[in-house]
Amino acid sequence: MIVVRDTETLKGKRLVATIGFFDGVHLGHRFLIHELKQVAEAAGLPSAVITFPEHPRAVLHADYQPKLLNSFEEKLKHLASTGIDYCIVLDFTLELSRLTAKEFITTVLADRLHVDTLLIGYDHRFGYNREDGFEQYVTYGEACDMRVIKASQYSEGEAAVSSSEIRKLLAECRVEEAAHLLTYPYGLKGSIVSGYKVGRKLGFPTANIQVDEPFKIIPGIGVYAVRVYLNGQRYKGMLYIGNRPTLDNGDNITLEVNILNFSGNIYNNEITVTFIQHVRGDIKFDTLDQLIDQLKKDRETVDRILTE
């Protein structure tokens, strides 16, 4: 996949393209992209996904804090895995947001990006205030010799697959269901920072994680079985998200992972965790001994899950 930021490099090319934010690059997105590749192959033209590095709502509303499934780099990696020819990166600006659908199709898709065929997601709308629909897009495309077609709808069972639904699953700790819809386990990347070192005193040393991407969604509170990627190696991990009620941590939410069968100083290292299964919710224990007993059970559960 060739990532295109300078659209001048597309001169002389004709493309079969689709457009969207593609957060998560989930099953629904992959279904659309598969159809895109089929249309492109039939036309004998390269396939292209047009996307944005920033969430459009974050540009339009300064106080909006998106909760995303992917950083931009992760999104590019997952798009590349689909086998498309080009990923065209457009900066979503206020000026771009003010273009009507007709202006966008004419000046951006046709004149600037040389789109021959535009495949539209079955429920996708674009242009200022999303005022127009598919029928209007077809008319605007015909005026500049562009074919506009609507993609088939994809559903998983009776439910449509959406980034919003996957975010909801993660917030509800349903990481296995989220992984199925994403086609990969959800992950977080961050730096290991110094904590209170309470876990070490309890016999469960933990690495406290400061997530690199502030807009990425944090799954719901609880204990998880996770895969840990550190210094080129993969480990089993027991990860906790919460405010440590037994230790009176206030309202501060922490992410800390106990790496099974590992010892060593790893502060300031980069770490990635991928969520495999939710083990339990948060519990406030009356004593530290009760907490330690539960952590021993949790570690056995995590080890079994990650060994299966």
Please tell me what each predicted stretch does.
Residues 2-8, 67, 88:
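Short acidic-hydrophobic, aromatic-tinged amphipathic segments that line or gate anion-handling sites
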Residues 141-240:
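Glycine-rich, Lys/Arg-enriched anion-binding loops that position phosphate/diphosphate groups
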Residues 9-71:
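N-terminal catalytic cores of NTP/NDP-binding nucleotidyl/phosphoryl-transfer enzymes
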Residues 58-144:
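N-terminal Rossmann-like or analogous alpha/beta NTP/dinucleotide-binding catalytic cores
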Residues 195-308:
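Phosphate/ribose-recognition catalytic cores of enzymes acting on nucleotide-derived substrates
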Residues 26, 79, 118, 178, ...:
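Residue-level signal for inorganic ion chemistry
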